[in-house]
C-alpha cells in the first residue's frame, strides 16, 4: 500500500465538488421558482 503523497488534494476536490453541486442546486431551484412565479 502506498501512502498518498498529497493528503490535502482530496479534501480540496471534495469541497470543490460540493461547491459545484450547491451552485447547481441553487440554479435548478431558481429555474423552478421563476417558472412557478411567471406561470
UniProtKB/Swiss-Prot annotation:
Keyword set, alphabetical order: Membrane, Photosynthesis, Photosystem II, Reaction center, Thylakoid, Transmembrane, Transmembrane helix
Source organism superkingdom: Bacteria
Keyword Protein biosynthesis: no
S-S bonds: none
Chain segments annotated as transmembrane: 18-38
Subcellular location field: Cellular thylakoid membrane
GO biological process terms, semicolon-separated: photosynthesis
Membrane topology qualifier: Single-pass membrane protein
Gene Ontology cellular component terms for the protein in this record: photosystem II reaction center; plasma membrane-derived thylakoid membrane
Pfam families: PsbL
Subunit description: PSII is composed of 1 copy each of membrane proteins PsbA, PsbB, PsbC, PsbD, PsbE, PsbF, PsbH, PsbI, PsbJ, PsbK, PsbL, PsbM, PsbT, PsbX, PsbY, Psb30/Ycf12, peripheral proteins PsbO, CyanoQ (PsbQ), PsbU, PsbV and a large number of cofactors. It forms dimeric complexes.
Function according to Swiss-Prot or TrEMBL: One of the components of the core complex of photosystem II (PSII). PSII is a light-driven water:plastoquinone oxidoreductase that uses light energy to abstract electrons from H(2)O, generating O(2) and a proton gradient subsequently used for ATP formation. It consists of a core antenna complex that captures photons, and an electron transfer chain that converts photonic excitation into a charge separation. This subunit is found at the monomer-monomer interface and is required for correct PSII assembly and/or dimerization.
Similarity section: Belongs to the PsbL family.
The protein's name: Photosystem II reaction center protein L
Gene coding for it: psbL
Amino acid at each position: 500500500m502506498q501512502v498518498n503523497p498529497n493528503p490535502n488534494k482530496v479534501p480540496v476536490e471534495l469541497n470543490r465538488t460540493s461547491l459545484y453541486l450547491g451552485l447547481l442546486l441553487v440554479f435548478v431551484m431558481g429555474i423552478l421558482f421563476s417558472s412557478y412565479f411567471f406561470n
